[in-house]
Amino acid sequence: SYIKLFLDTFEKQLHCEVQILRTTTDSPSKYEIDEMIHSADLIYLGGGNYIHMFTQWKEHRLDEKLLLALQQGTLIAGYSAGAMCWFTSSIRSDYEGSGYIESNGWGIVNKRFCPHYNQLNRMNAFHSFLQNHQGNIEGIALEDNCALYITEESFEIIGEPEKAWEFYMSDKTLIRQHFDITLKSYL
């Protein structure tokens, strides 16, 4: 399973102490949630159903707790749906198999985001979304096995730079280009 793979990687290979917070199958107390988040050096938000995750986070006030942890310097990583929350909005599956729709995020990063950009249908949907959006819009798209490291001042790519894209509008034309700032991946 996804969690077993995560544990194998972080506990066995990287020798990290790992705690898993599940709000759907477990019923952690407010104290347990606060303690887990407060004691973490790194918080990893996994992928999955974005709307379900967002609902669960609000119910347990995880959105507020994660934003506070970020402000206090905790490193927070996200994959797919776990990355989408940080952006103004993202493109995601409609979960009915008929297409892609926009979902709002927390707006910490004032750009639109597309994970799994290597999937042709998702790529085309993201292009259409950006082109049809009113006003000045900027976007970021990442193919699988590529990460974006965000600080207050910069964006840096971890992985292959040809898998990371940035978008902006110029004279009503969508411009797509690769990021030019890269960190060498040690994974």
Task: Spell out what each predicted region is.
Residues 50-60:
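Glycine/threonine-rich flexible loop motifs
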Residues 7, 33-34, 63-67, 126-130:
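Short amphipathic alpha-helical segments and helix-helix/interface helices
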Residues 50-51, 83-85, 147-149:
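Short, active-site-adjacent cap segments at secondary-structure transitions
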Residues 44-47, 70-89:
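Catalytic nucleophile loop
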Residues 1-12, 90-92, 96-187:
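C-terminal and late-domain segments of enzyme folds
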Residues 35-39, 60-73:
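Catalytic-core regions built around general acid/base machinery
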Residues 1-42, 46, 175, 183-187:
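N-terminal beta1-alpha1 cap of cysteine-dependent amidohydrolase-like domains
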Residues 20-22, 44-45, 77-79, 139-141:
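General beta-strand structural signal in soluble alpha/beta enzymes
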